[in-house]
């Protein structure tokens, strides 16, 4: 299935010019500078130095297949049908620090970028600040052109790409929260939260979810909607784990 997805026609990222400019400056950094900017090991810095050196000649792949974090493992994009991908292309935005916003079939090359990276192009400010003025109006207009509802399934660090208070004031933001209940206490566990975001994204795509209330039917790995908790903008999904003590 992955080969079939890769064979589909690729779209061009909306902010490709900006991404190319950022990648060009990243390619001028040495490995030591990359290690500091990306806050990573020297091995990863060397790997990404190579990536940026060959950025413009590397093979492009659809954005939905380019990431391998916890959320994407549970999204399982390579097994989506062509009609699923067509729906996702119309309704899903992927947030990232190099390309800004991506559609699922936008062609991109592998990279690593952190929101704290500071470049001459960004005026010495974190790259998230560089994007804020470019993406906020675009995202708001995109959501309003659809149904005015934004289902927020990105991790909170990506909110830095936008004037998030403006986004919340101009469109209806629904942000599901995922908790594990142990001994009567609710705990948000990062790995589970990331996994559930990916699984819920797939659920929305496969079932063509159109309204927030339809999310109540979502269940995954023991997580289910808990109507007694949260509020419409923050629906809670809870997994109950029984802990026995002796």
Predicted segments with their positions:
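Active-site helix-to-loop segments that bind/position phosphate- or nucleotide-bearing substrates
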Residues: 1-79
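Internal, well-folded beta-alpha domain core
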Residues: 77-231, 236-246
């Amino acid at each position: 299935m992955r080969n079939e997805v890769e064979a589909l026609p690729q779209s061009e990222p909306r902010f490709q010019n900006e991404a190319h400019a950022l990648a060009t400056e990243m390619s001028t950094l040495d490995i030591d500078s990359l290690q500091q900017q990306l806050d990573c090991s020297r091995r990863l810095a060397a790997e990404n130095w190579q990536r940026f050196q060959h950025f413009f000649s590397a093979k492009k792949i659809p954005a939905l297949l380019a990431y391998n974090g916890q959320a994407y493992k549970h999204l399982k994009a390579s097994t989506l049908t062509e009609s699923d991908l067509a729906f996702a292309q119309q309704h899903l935005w992927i947030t990232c620090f190099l390309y800004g916003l991506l559609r699922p079939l936008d062609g991109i090359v592998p990279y690593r970028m952190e929101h704290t990276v500071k470049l001459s192009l960004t005026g010495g400010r974190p790259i998230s600040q560089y994007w804020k003025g470019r993406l906020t109006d675009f995202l708001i207009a995109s959501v309003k052109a659809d149904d005015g509802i934004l289902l927020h399934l990105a991790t909170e660090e990506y909110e830095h790409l936008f004037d998030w208070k403006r986004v919340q004031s101009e469109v209806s933001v629904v942000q599901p929260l995922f908790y594990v209940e142990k001994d009567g206490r609710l705990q948000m566990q990062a790995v589970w939260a990331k996994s559930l975001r990916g699984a819920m994204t797939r659920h929305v795509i496969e079932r063509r979810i159109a309204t927030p209330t339809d999310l109540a039917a979502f269940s995954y790995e023991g997580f289910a909607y808990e109507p007694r908790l949260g509020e419409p903008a923050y629906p809670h999904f809870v997994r109950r784990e029984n802990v026995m003590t002796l």
